[in-house]
Swiss-Prot record:
Belongs to the universal ribosomal protein uS12 family. Residues 113-123 have a biased composition (Basic residues). GO terms for cellular component: small ribosomal subunit. This is Small ribosomal subunit protein uS12. Residues 124-135 have a biased composition (Low complexity). NCBIfam families: rpsL_bact (TIGR00981). InterPro entries: NA-bd_OB-fold, Ribosomal_uS12, Ribosomal_uS12_bac. GO terms for biological process: translation. GO terms for molecular function: rRNA binding; structural constituent of ribosome; tRNA binding.
Length: 135
């Protein structure tokens, strides 16, 4: 415990907060160009082929970003928008690609949670494409 004289001489330093998404540089989103689109496997105990992309951002960083949703149209040189948000079972993936903006198309036939996947509202007159339950 410091004395009052020591505190007068040198005040307490506040611990600096470390950001979880440094490549965004305090912006909510960033634009970037895909340099590589590939699949990778998650940590134990999960098993899948997760779709990810290596993205070179306008901030100068090159990061790995997750492509959410079923199916995508991204390839090398696609221009995408990324946001923060890690994927718990993919080490090193700290960003998500925003679907439905720039070159990343929205998820097809998405009925619920559409805003998170850039899907347009389905027309009310259309018959349901994949009716789950039938009585």
């Amino acid at each position: 415990m410091p004395t009052i004289q020591q505190l007068i001489r040198e005040e307490r330093s506040v611990a600096a907060r470390k950001t979880k998404s440094p490549a965004l540089k305090a912006c909510p989103q960033r634009r970037g160009v895909c340099t590589r689109v590939y699949t990778t496997t998650p940590k134990k105990p999960n098993s899948a082929l997760r779709k990810v992309a290596r993205v070179r951002l306008t901030s100068g960083f090159e990061v790995t970003a997750y492509i959410p949703g079923i199916g995508h149209n991204l390839q090398e040189h696609s221009v995408v928008m990324i946001r923060g948000g890690r994927v718990k079972d993919l080490p090193g993936v700290r960003y998500h690609i925003i679907r439905g903006t720039l070159d990343a198309a929205g998820v097809k036939d998405r009925k619920q949670g559409r805003s998170k996947y850039g899907a347009k509202r389905p027309k009310p007159g259309q018959a349901p494409a994949a009716a789950g339950k039938k009585k």
